[in-house]
């Protein structure tokens, strides 16, 4: 049985978040959460929260053994980019891009 969780419009760069997501793909739940706990990247906290949510969804569905869950699929897609302008010298303005990410995780039971 599979369970999933999604996080939309996270104020994280998709490129930097993919580095964190690649560390936990295919790992067991406890191993993945421990890896994220000791990761210095800011996106690791949100990804671990998302994994915990997916585990809670699995418990709600009635998965027999939560300890047998592993990260089957996890991916990051780019969301909309918030564009802001900051005033510069001589009446100019510079563009500031604030990227967002959509993160999706699917957990499955080991056979």
UniProtKB/Swiss-Prot annotation:
Belongs to the universal ribosomal protein uL22 family. HAMAP family: Ribosomal_uL22_B. It comes from Geotalea uraniireducens (strain Rf4) (Geobacter uraniireducens). The keyword rRNA-binding applies. PANTHER family: CHLOROPLAST 50S RIBOSOMAL PROTEIN L22-RELATED, LARGE RIBOSOMAL SUBUNIT PROTEIN UL22M. Keywords: Ribonucleoprotein, Ribosomal protein, RNA-binding, rRNA-binding. GO terms for cellular component: cytosolic large ribosomal subunit. Part of the 50S ribosomal subunit. One of its GO terms (molecular function) is rRNA binding. GO terms for biological process: translation. This is Large ribosomal subunit protein uL22. This protein binds specifically to 23S rRNA; its binding is stimulated by other ribosomal proteins, e.g. L4, L17, and L20. It is important during the early stages of 50S assembly. It makes multiple contacts with different domains of the 23S rRNA in the assembled 50S subunit and ribosome. The globular domain of the protein is located near the polypeptide exit tunnel on the outside of the subunit, while an extended beta-hairpin is found that lines the wall of the exit tunnel in the center of the 70S ribosome. It comes from the Bacteria. InterPro entries: Ribosomal_uL22, Ribosomal_uL22_bac/chlpt-type, Ribosomal_uL22_bac/org-type, Ribosomal_uL22_CS, Ribosomal_uL22_sf. The gene is rplV.
């Amino acid at each position: 049985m599979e369970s999933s969780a999604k996080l939309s419009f996270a104020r994280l760069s998709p490129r930097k978040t993919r580095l964190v997501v690649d560390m936990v793909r295919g790992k067991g739940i406890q191993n993945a959460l421990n890896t994220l706990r000791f990761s210095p990247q800011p996106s690791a906290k949100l990804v671990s929260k998302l994994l915990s949510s997916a585990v809670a969804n699995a418990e709600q569905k009635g998965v027999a053994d939560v300890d047998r869950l592993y990260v089957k699929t996890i991916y990051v897609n780019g969301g909309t980019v918030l564009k802001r302008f900051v005033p510069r010298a001589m009446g100019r303005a510079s563009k500031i891009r604030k990227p967002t990410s959509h993160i999706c995780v699917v957990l499955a039971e080991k056979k």
